[in-house]
Amino acid sequence: MAAAALRAPTQVTVSPETHMDLTKGCVTFEDIAIYFSQDEWGLLDEAQRLLYLEVMLENFALVASLGCGHGTEDEETPSDQNVSVGVSQSKAGSSTQKTQSCEMCVPVLKDILHLADLPGQKPYLVGECTNHHQHQKHHSAKKSLKRDMDRASYVKCCLFCMSLKPFRKWEVGKDLPAMLRLLRSLVFPGGKKPGTITECGEDIRSQKSHYKSGECGKASRHKHTPVYHPRVYTGKKLYECSKCGKAFRGKYSLVQHQRVHTGERPWECNECGKFFSQTSHLNDHRRIHTGERPYECSECGKLFRQNSSLVDHQKIHTGARPYECSQCGKSFSQKATLVKHQRVHTGERPYKCGECGNSFSQSAILNQHRRIHTGAKPYECGQCGKSFSQKATLIKHQRVHTGERPYKCGDCGKSFSQSSILIQHRRIHTGARPYECGQCGKSFSQKSGLIQHQVVHTGERPYECNKCGNSFSQCSSLIHHQKCHNT
């Protein structure tokens, strides 16, 4: 039924604002395509590769729907307000001219779809599949010609159907796999893929290339196929951001970057309504709702939602600390931790509270501070029901129930439930007294000792007996006094 639907003529309406005059030179697929070298492709995780496939198919479909790209057939010149492009199935008796122009779409799609079949391997640039196409014609020209002509027709129909779909509503992982299967069935009928053993027993990928680039020597296997050396080899950045001057190899990368300046977040989570600037960020976020953790540490078996989190975690096992502070020489396993640390030296506090105006060096600290104003205590103890504003406070509290004392003194072996208590205890062994009185110069090992001492200078007596009304400067003195009433 799906195949029958694709054979039916499809009408595409293009608004005057988005349509480009075909007589003045269209933007071709190569103008907006993004290609990766083998090393670059190897750095992408699964979600990023899936995003790449989505973007390539989306761009190719949109270019094809405007009648641009590789010279699609049945083009009509634009009229007053709208342009209607009719696509119908090619007949066996179509002209050679149209067959060749339609046939150009097939190798491009083959390159894109090859990535779906070979994750993590070198992506094939345009020309790999074209050469395979030419090699097959060497054995059966007429049979191949008719098959490719019909195939290109179906691909075109499919692309026009794709152009009707609102691509901003695409859900990576849902719509895309179905579209890939549909395109693959049209481009690779019978499940056959390029780069396989052909009728003469020769592996196409082992053939030598004949058409080379004069700049870098990169070869193309079809004389009509451009070699994309500027973006892959020289590292030349073609698209520059007008706001900050940062340059990118692909136009789509620039569009993504510009959302940093515009604040645009077109991708919405249908679970919680949160918006994101990139589909890859949305995919990472969705795992919060699904609980999916597809990335596993081979050392300890710990699971992570994002590949980047796994990479950061693995530095615990390797001990790698590649990010060093230029001020004090301290090194960190994560760049984000270094950035936070550097604010100690710069004094930068970029996160400001809208209620009281206090500023903070980290967003997490600001979030904790805001709970003072809201009174929110989201962390509840499962044992006694007591709630806390910070997760760290809940963890400390839970040790009251469990009796856990994870902090051990290396000098005497005594253990403590909190690191701060261990730090105070160690001063017994070291003799450190970091808290000094500004009035008399007397120093103390604990801040509480200094506070108690300062009452001597101020004359303050905050501790009052509820029996006789006498007041005292220290709590211990009040407790000693109350024993008189008890006797």
Swiss-Prot record:
What GO cellular component is one of the record's annotations? nucleus
Task: Write the protein's name.
Answer: Zinc finger protein interacting with ribonucleoprotein K
User: What molecular function terms (GO) are annotated for this protein?
Assistant: DNA-binding transcription factor activity, RNA polymerase II-specific; RNA polymerase II cis-regulatory region sequence-specific DNA binding; zinc ion binding
Keywords (alphabetical) are: DNA-binding, Metal-binding, Nucleus, Repeat, Repressor, Transcription, Transcription regulation, Zinc, Zinc-finger
Answer whether the UniProt record assigns the keyword Translocase to this protein.
Answer: no
Q: What does this protein do?
A: May be a transcriptional repressor.
Tissue spec: Expressed at high levels in gastric glands, and at low levels in colon and small intestine. Silenced through promoter methylation in gastric glands with intestinal metaplasia.
Question: Which PROSITE patterns would you find in this protein's record?
Answer: KRAB, ZINC_FINGER_C2H2_1, ZINC_FINGER_C2H2_2
Give the residue ranges for region: Disordered. Answer: 71-94
